Curated annotation (Swiss-Prot):
Belongs to the MTFR1 family. Pfam families: Mito_fiss_reg. It comes from Mus musculus (Mouse). Residues 191-286, 298-322 are annotated as: Disordered. This is Mitochondrial fission regulator 2. Coiled coil: none annotated. It is found in: Mitochondrion. It comes from the Eukaryota.
Amino acid sequence: MPRDGTNEQRFLELPSPMSFILNILRNVLEYFGVPVDQDLLICQNKNCGSARSIVRIIGRRLPLKPCRRPHFELIPHVNSTESDDYELRVPSFADVLCVANDEEASCLRFRHSLWQKKEERKIAPFYPSKLTWDPSSPGLRQNKTETDDLPVNEAAIKKIAALEDELTFLRSQIAAIVAMQDLRESRETGFIDLSDEQVPPSSATTGLSVEPDHAPSVVLPPPPPPPPPPQFSLQPPSSLPMQPGSANTHDIDSLATEMERQLSGVKKTDDSHHSKSQRLRDVPNMLDVLKDVNKVRLRPVERSPGGRPVQKRKRRSSEWDPVSLISNALKQKFAFQDDSFDRENSSWECSPFSSPETSRF
């Protein structure tokens, strides 16, 4: 009997699960600073706001920064003929979908982003080229045009101007080099146009001599002199009488065409010589090929006392060896294609180390 009494007393002293949970809740509330006596008031009175639930009470006690709440104000379509006085109307929950994309919600703004100055509170007139967001017409989202101009960057304009100046300077340099090359060719061939003597120096040459500081790092080396063409007589044929006017121009044209033909022939011969020299360069030199012959080492081969190489005994593989099975199957399949015995790796060899044969078909 005393044992039963002690067991019953111990059972009564054990805490129930509900009391354990209540103790945990009270400790949590005391940790967050919530009075324990307020629990009964929460259960009896149905308060509103932050005292409606335990979660709200705990959240009110915690030092958390509240999130920013967006306030939506939908601006109606205002034409230029209408007045600036208007009333903002509150949108429905269907307009909240446009918040995901800021570009589509161009007509929405937060309350903290409103202009503070009174003169800036006026709404710009509605232009047909600038479309606003409309939930009923999703096709306008893709066809929206932007009329806002980008700010002008002065640094970019300066860079563009500098690049243009450098480009003009390079063009003048190229023109001067071409003119010098033409004069050199005409002097070498002995053909000088009389009309070129009275021409003043071109602007390209003057720009090259006056403005050398624009791009000092872009100075090009002088071109190599062209190969001298074969000499030919500049005198007109004696049978033709010299006439002022048409006869003189005819002789000049004939000389020019003859010069072009000879220059083309010289270019062809130069190209042929160049191609021949290139072919000779591509052919390998035998001295370079044979200079490393002494460094070649042969593989040592076992020889018999008579001097003949010792032939290795062929290993007889078992019937269940996978290498022998595969080799026998391949031999039976390709035996009819090549039955010659003079090949190094013939199909009749039973060595598993022989190289595979390639089919002719």
